[in-house]
Amino acid sequence: MRQRTLANGLQVVSLATNGGTVSVQVWYRVGGKDDPAGRSGFAHLFEHLMFKRTKHMPDEMFDRLTEDVGGQNNAFTAQDMTVYQDEVPSNHLERILWAEAERMVHLQVDQASFESERKVVVEELRERVLADPYGRLFNALPELCFERHPYKRPVIGSEADLNAATLDDVRRFHATYYRPDNAVLIVVGDFDPAQLDGWIDRYFGPVKAPAGPIPRVTEREPARTQDARQE
């Protein structure tokens, strides 16, 4: 396994293997706990928006770059991270690296795309949580377990908060958290290490890290001295 850090702060972890395929993941240090006040579920909503148009790619281009060549892509949001995953034949690795750098920098979400994807996420909330007794249970547990820490908010959020989100929120969130010094690029598979380094330097190297600090959650959870119950 090899590790290095670019001048802009991007951490790179790679492991060369055999087999003709390669897996690329980009981990961003932002998740549900970082949702803006009154915008629970926003990190997860933003994950969906990252598959939309960029300056040089049309909507859903990641499906074309992965599924059309026999690969796949996916993403997930947790409390502490948002992760984007791509698996493709090795000869398509360079395109995926370019595309991941492209959406890190040049995401362009318009109002129509934003509204469309918000409806998808709200429907996901209704189906997986509100319409499912177990979904409601697991959604309620964090609020019962935590008093102050943002972990108390469910990653999927609430319908009211999702509907309150705006396009300006999207732009601020992208500029604040989707930056090279807040990300880890992981590449595992069949590739030449020297060639991989060259591609990463070419596509991610020019990405500038903003001068301002990355906001971090500093709220401390008080010690629990008794059981938490909800009837």
Give the residues covered by each predicted segment.
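Short beta-strands and strand-coil junctions in structured, solvent-facing domains, enriched
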Residues: 31-36, 106, 193-194
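Active-site SXXK
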Residues: 40-54
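M16/insulysin-pitrilysin zinc metalloprotease superfamily fold
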Residues: 53-56, 87-118
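Short amphipathic alpha-helices in soluble, non-transmembrane regions
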Residues: 97-103, 197-204
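Non-catalytic, conformational "gating/processing" segments within enzyme and secreted inhibitor domains
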Residues: 118, 167, 171-203
